[in-house]
């Protein structure tokens, strides 16, 4: 199995993204893909996340990261077949191929910004700046609620992935607003792919309900994963997935 074969088997064709979509991803660093999940799929995922949050309790998210003011879950690859779409959807994988070339899933997590919480400083999802075009990581936000200005929609600085700097290099306080920032709003079921070198951050949830999303994070194949999929893959998960999905996860068997 190789990248081209895996993507072909998962339905990724050369025209899975339009020229305009590729241009927007290159220029702005983000691309909304509407209607990726149906209302039924969104409802089923939210139900499963609520179940997992209740079962895991204080340990929820520990496999990767816990964050004050949020409900987080990690290692979702192993926790329900509903989550397979996040590393198998042709449009999303086509966007990852456009940004990264040869890639793998780094982690699949959920994040719910709780009421009165969720504000983050602007940051990039990488440890250091990279030269424009030499991108190493790319993320996708799977909207499980409508993202609005009131409930903590993600803010980004369009084009900042091409600056070759980090927010702290140019801002006295990355928690402040940036004059060029915009909010990524959209309907539940939308997926927003964004170059992880793009400056971004959550905003304050000023409603009385959590703002829920999945994050499917991808990286170049030579990089370590945020969660070592090979070390965590369960037998039942491995057995239900296809060889192409195994390749996207970079797993070759079970331990």
Question: For each of these PLM feature ranges, what is it?
Answer:
Residues 1-28, 34-131, 246-247:
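Non-heme Fe(II)-dependent double-stranded beta-helix
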Residues 2-11, 55, 191, 198, ...:
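Non-heme Fe(II)/2-oxoglutarate
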Residues 114, 144-146, 218-220:
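Non-catalytic surface loops within mature trypsin-like serine protease
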Residues 122-125, 169-178, 208-210, 229-234:
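Short, surface-exposed loop/helix-turn segments at secondary-structure junctions
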Residues 125-137, 179-180, 186, 209-210:
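A short beta-loop-beta micro-motif enriched in histidine and acidic residues
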Residues 127-134, 144-153:
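Active-site region of the double-stranded beta-helix
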Residues 147-203, 223, 235-240:
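Double-stranded beta-helix
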